[in-house]
Amino acid sequence: MSRTTPDNVTEFEPAEVRELLAEGKILLVDVREPMEYAAERITGALLYPLSTFDASQLPSDGPRRIVFSCAAGGRSLTAARQRMALGQPAAHMAGGISQWKAEGLPVVRIDPRTGRPVEEPG
């Protein structure tokens, strides 16, 4: 169940994020670095590394809510705070992809034998 951090950022649990993604209600933005994203990612997540992040470059009036994710929740919270500083709604996924995997949710990895992406359980 979602909750709000002390600085008013909405925080979703991984299972909620998975459901909202499946329903097309959110845009999941992964703020990890490209090498982290290449190693494993959540299906449907878009990459926008925090190291080059500019919250003003994200859509402000799209039909889907933007939810940020990272490895453990710190960088995604930073991105959400930056977006909120612009007066835009923002949310992040608690625990990042680490928590996502701990809950057994699937990630996409590259099969080293074929070079193709494969979805595997977390």
What label would you give each PLM region?
Residues 1-27, 34-65, 74-122:
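Rhodanese-like catalytic fold shared by cysteine-dependent sulfurtransferases
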